[in-house]
Amino acid sequence: MDRYQHLFQRLAAHNQGAFVPFVTIGDPNPQQSLRIMQTLVEAGADALELGIPFSDPLADGPTIQGAISALDSGTKPIRCFEADQAPIRAQDIPIYLLMYANLVYARGIDNFYQRCQQAGVDSVLIADVPTNESAEFGPAAKKYAIHPIFIAPPTASDETLQSVAELGSGYTYLLSRSGVTGAETKANMPVHALLERLNQFSAPPRRLGFGISEPEQVKQAIESGAAGAISGSAVVKIIEHHLAKPEAMLAELKTFVSAMKSATKHDK
């Protein structure tokens, strides 16, 4: 049983959905980054979505761009796989990477997925690679048992949703709206119609992302039929607002994640 199967079994047993925060590895610095990830897990995060620093994050809004562009913290892409940077092995929860194709190509596709396996990564979402351009990544992902994750946009055709369902595994990244990420632009609710279409194609469990910043949005996502919610910009903003007070940063992150996780409980 892999960590995805274990997670979904546990959530089903407790009548809950998943809450998944996003952070960039090495933000604001390597040492505090590890403390942040540990705090997120201790506060109740069901999984972690991790970004690898990259100078041109096309799909991310200004908040997350600020974190990903902070390469001067000393965190280079290759460092993210080194032992002292990996918060992964000790965690009994799924770890996702959200990244861009150039970082996969940089060291070779096979080598990249091998490094993911060695670091304890469960899945990879390449944000700028749609399903119809993903064929070259599939064999290496399968070889190293890394779940390929694909995005289901709200304007997708049935053909696109079918390919997302057939090629993806682990979970499906369901967009609450078009555009780039950011808590500045609220998620569009509800998403019943898109979820129903994905159900028709037996897509992997759906998690709603983009603009998720409040517990009520998480609750609405779960009530709409999503398996969980992902929040990135709201988490990154907390980090940015407490750069000079690392302990206050961790305390606010703990409060935020606890509240968001509590909102995943299904009403009986």
Curated annotation (Swiss-Prot):
It comes from the Bacteria. One of its GO terms (cellular component) is cytosol. Pathway: Amino-acid biosynthesis; L-tryptophan biosynthesis; L-tryptophan from chorismate: step 5/5. InterPro entries: Aldolase_TIM (IPR013785), RibuloseP-bd_barrel (IPR011060), Trp_synthase_alpha_AS (IPR018204), Trp_synthase_suA (IPR002028). The keyword Lyase applies. GO terms for molecular function: tryptophan synthase activity. Its EC number is 4.2.1.20. Keywords: Amino-acid biosynthesis, Aromatic amino acid biosynthesis, Lyase, Tryptophan biosynthesis. It catalyses: (1S,2R)-1-C-(indol-3-yl)glycerol 3-phosphate + L-serine = D-glyceraldehyde 3-phosphate + L-tryptophan + H2O. Tetramer of two alpha and two beta chains. The alpha subunit is responsible for the aldol cleavage of indoleglycerol phosphate to indole and glyceraldehyde 3-phosphate. Belongs to the TrpA family. This is Tryptophan synthase alpha chain. It comes from Vibrio metschnikovii. The gene is trpA.
